[in-house]
Amino acid sequence: MMKVLVVFALLVTLISYSSSEGIDDLEADELLSLMANEQTRKECIPKHHECTSNKHGCCRGNFFKYKCQCTTVVTQDGEQTERCFCGTPPHHKAAELVVGFGKKIFG
């Protein structure tokens, strides 16, 4: 009976060691993915900054990604130019307001 317990303990030790190696590999892959996401996040355009040259490069807000919102600006010379900035669209603002209100009520 003692031999069976020793063999069982040895098998459990080997299995836990091999599974922890797999977990370490998984954590390394996740870490690389997070580092890549962090690099992308550093390169994105923050809220209220100009996005005229990169309309799909806005950062993420609390719940949604900011959208590049453009307007036509007329200079004193009468020349029209398009100016864009990263911002939160009205329907996203409404959704964030509802979620924030729900969190306050339901905790």
From Swiss-Prot:
Q: Which key words tag this protein in UniProt?
A: Disulfide bond, Knottin, Secreted, Signal, Toxin
Which InterPro entries does this UniProt record tie to the protein? Spider_toxin_CSTX_knottin, Spider_toxin_CSTX_Knottin_CS
Q: State the organism named in the record.
A: Lycosa singoriensis
Compartments where found? Secreted
Q: In which tissues is it expressed?
A: Expressed by the venom gland.
Which parts of this protein are propeptide?
21-41
Q: Where is the signal peptide?
A: 1-20
Q: Which domain of life is it from?
A: Eukaryota
Which cystines does this chain contain? 44-59, 51-68, 58-86, 70-84
Family statement:
Belongs to the neurotoxin 19 (CSTX) family. 04 (U1-Lctx) subfamily.
According to UniProt, the name of this protein is U1-lycotoxin-Ls1b
**Any Gene Ontology CC annotation:** extracellular region
**Notes concerning its domains:** The presence of a 'disulfide through disulfide knot' structurally defines this protein as a knottin.
